[in-house]
Amino acid sequence: MKINLSMRELVSRLSTTLKTAIALSVLTACTANDSVSLTSNISNTSGVLLESQTKITDGALHFDGKKLNHNTFENPSKSQAYDYFFGRNISAHGDAVKPYKHFVFMTWYKGGKEERNVMLSRFNTKTGVVKTIQFPHRHTGFRGDPLVGESHNTIGLAVSPLNGTIHMVYDMHAYVDDDETGRFKGRFVDDFFRYSFSVAGAADVPDDEFTLEQFVKDTSELSQGADDYKHLTMTGNLQDKENFSALTYPKFYTSDDGELLHYMRWGGNNNGAYYFNKYDAKNQKWTRFTPFNHKDQKTHGNAYNWGLYGQMKYINGKLRVGFQQRSANNDDRFKYQNGVYYAYSDHPDGLGNWKNVDGEDMTWPLVNSDEIKIFEPGDYIDHTAPNSVHIVTGFDWTVTENDDVHFITHVRSTDTKRSDYKEVSIHAFKPANAVDFTITTDFTGADSIYTSGDSIFIIGLKNGYPFVEKAKGGSNDFEVVYQQASGVKFDHGTIHIENGKAYYYLMEKGAGNALPLHLQVIDLGVTE
């Protein structure tokens, strides 16, 4: 595989953006408590438009206190402010929104600091009703301290189109059984994995029947009581519990055949693996986890251990993996991540036939990440000293229905005060029939990249308002096709794309640790 480098003139890019901006729709302010539909009186030739905006709740959990570190986390504030570790966001964060038939399901944590319950809302687009279930479980906080919020403890969500069951995995960050001498001080003994699921057909029940009674209680020997809806394994077999230990970042996908797939990261930041499993809708049972790559790679002959920062995705009919590596080698030039790595499986369940981007067989489970490396973003900064290159934010990837492969990433100097400081955003893409990747730095950067049909999209917030940029798959020709200009301002959100629509699940800007959540449904003007 070769790599081509391209750089378009910045003036050309600005000119295109300005022309597009002239034609943008100016949206009416959206302040209603319930679902509303918004239209534009200005022609939008892109076909991108906001279908509706719906308030889901007035009080979702948000961390509004101080950011703590390893020196301060044992002394959090006992006042109303909610101190946190890592990031502020835990609601409208992660794998938290999924459409199913004429419903949209959303997970969140209840605010404020003293509440923290796991919540599940269902928006019925036919009746306009938002019905919410409150679960007994409360966010446990960083390493089990409820006074320290933990942004990694997101709630993964799925609905099976084959039997209407609802599945949630939540509130964990590499938790394990340990004792008072361990990292978690014995706080997660037989409670290190949290899985809740419903009876068959629960996703379809009438609004007044969408209640906690649709979910299955844990009646095993490890049950924590009559109101325990948490299950320690997804298989239903407690003998499998070690297979569900030390996991983080739940994410669900639905295959083209309606099968549910689920993956998580096993291990830690610089020594981890992607584990995935599958739901058998007929028997209503999940498989054990299967590794994409080995953890503890040194024990398998690699020169060093490494972790993954990216995602496993089921997209365009295949299970795929794209990530950046965080090496346990602390003496190289990379402070955190490096590289762009990618693989896909020709097996419908990912159980073999794994290949690199060129279609060549790779070792499975993977040990040496170089087998699937595409390029090195760190080469775009001329630093060689240990830990001088900083790669953390702005990485994502997607594959269009035409099989165009796209990666975005961001690299900068670790020392922001050095005289030769450099910062670069990169877009690497390979059209379906191309042999080589094109890599361009004529890219403004983004947190995520999405696809629908043969198009690619960058969707995010600008000054608190949603925007959409669109380009044809296999190109870098992004144009702004949608920009909200008024209404509710948002702090952050998470997005799910399905059937040509973006389900943008958003938290409203505000003060305190209990803030409103909204759902925007944006038609992307794509026929799938």
Swiss-Prot record:
Signal peptide: 1-29
Main location per the UniProt record: secreted
Function: Ulvan lyase involved in ulvan degradation. Ulvan is the main polysaccharide component of the Ulvales (green seaweed) cell wall. It is composed of disaccharide building blocks comprising 3-sulfated rhamnose (Rha3S) linked to D-glucuronic acid (GlcA), L-iduronic acid (IduA), or D-xylose (Xyl). Ulvan lyase catalyzes preferentially the endolytic cleavage of the glycosidic bond between Rha3S and the uronic acid GlcA, but not IduA, producing oligosaccharides that have unsaturated 4-deoxy-L-threo-hex-4-enopyranosiduronic acid (deltaUA) at the non-reducing end.
Protein name from the UniProt record: Ulvan lyase, short isoform
Residues at the catalytic site: 152 (proton donor/acceptor)
Keywords: Calcium, Cell membrane, Lipoprotein, Lyase, Membrane, Metal-binding, Palmitate, Secreted, Signal
Temperature dependence: Optimum temperature is 40 degrees Celsius.
Effect of substituting residue 249 to F: Greatly reduces catalytic activity
Lipidated residue numbers (N-palmitoyl cysteine): 30
Any single GO CC term annotated in Swiss-Prot or TrEMBL for this entry: extracellular region
Residues at which substrate binds: 151-152, 309, 326, 390
Positions contributing to Ca(2+) 1 binding: 218, 228, 230
An example molecular function term from Gene Ontology annotations: lyase activity
Impact after mutating residue 265 to A: Abolishes catalytic activity
Activity response to pH changes: Optimum pH is 8.
Binding-site residues, Ca(2+) 2: 329, 332, 334
Lipid-carrying residues in chain (S-diacylglycerol cysteine): 30
EC number: 4.2.2.-
Residues carrying the site annotation Neutralizes the sugar carboxylate group at subsite +1: 265
Organism: Alteromonas sp. (strain LOR)
Record lineage: Bacteria, Pseudomonadati, Pseudomonadota, Gammaproteobacteria, Alteromonadales
Annotated compartments: Secreted; Cell membrane
Family note: Belongs to the polysaccharide lyase 24 family.
Membrane topology field: Lipid-anchor
